[in-house]
Swiss-Prot record:
Protein known as: OX-2 membrane glycoprotein homolog
Keyword Hydrolase: no
Taxonomic lineage: Viruses, Duplodnaviria, Heunggongvirae, Peploviricota, Herviviricetes
Membrane topology designation: Single-pass type I membrane protein
Self-association and partners: Interacts with human CD200R1.
Side of membrane Cytoplasmic, spans: 249-271
Domain Ig-like V-type, residue spans: 26-129
Amino acid sequence: MSSLFISLPWVAFIWLALLGAVGGARVQGPMRGSAALTCAITPRADIVSVTWQKRQLPGPVNVATYSHSYGVVVQTQYRHKANITCPGLWNSTLVIHNLAVDDEGCYLCIFNSFGGRQVSCTACLEVTSPPTGHVQVNSTEDADTVTCLATGRPPPNVTWAAPWNNASSTQEQFTDSDGLTVAWRTVRLPRGDNTTPSEGICLITWGNESISIPASIQGPLAHDLPAAQGTLAGVAITLVGLFGIFALHHCRRKQGGASPTSDDMDPLSTQ
């Protein structure tokens, strides 16, 4: 009998070792959207509760817990932010809403069994934002400077396709307060070179996706536009002034031609 009782802890240990939590997938969720993290335990065991934690320094933080006794309990800082959907003791799904950069990271799904024993798995979340882009052209007498800008998360890659791919260009980037990366590449095209093509294409790549944005350096110089507008305004003012002088002169001539004679003004005069 004593040998039986001695072997019971070893049996329990072997039983726990056979348990496994499945999940651990890497999930992507759109910024300001939602994402679902899922885990399950096989085979089914005597689980009393399931706890979701977020890994961070100096230690993990509880997000939400489910048990038959208390149902779903979400920690204060995650209320209106996260929830356990389809609650169960052998599988669990944590949904996070209104995703921001701070939500990115890895989460622990912990199955708690009798005796305080635990089986866990890890699911990691990546917050993404599909790229957007546009082209800016700045022209001077010496050169046309064309800049292609792209904003996204993870950082997008910006390149110039042929024929501008051989032109001198530089790429820079920075991350804004929302965690989005703004990347841009500038190409300088000297004027007076007849071999320089007037049209090019900016390529923005982001994972397996790509965006093509056409660019052109045709048209008037950017710095000439204000001067041209000023000239047109001056001509318009001059024309208005001349029209006013002409109208006033015409009105005076008309009044002078219709002036009454002295005889018309004295009805009592006799011959």
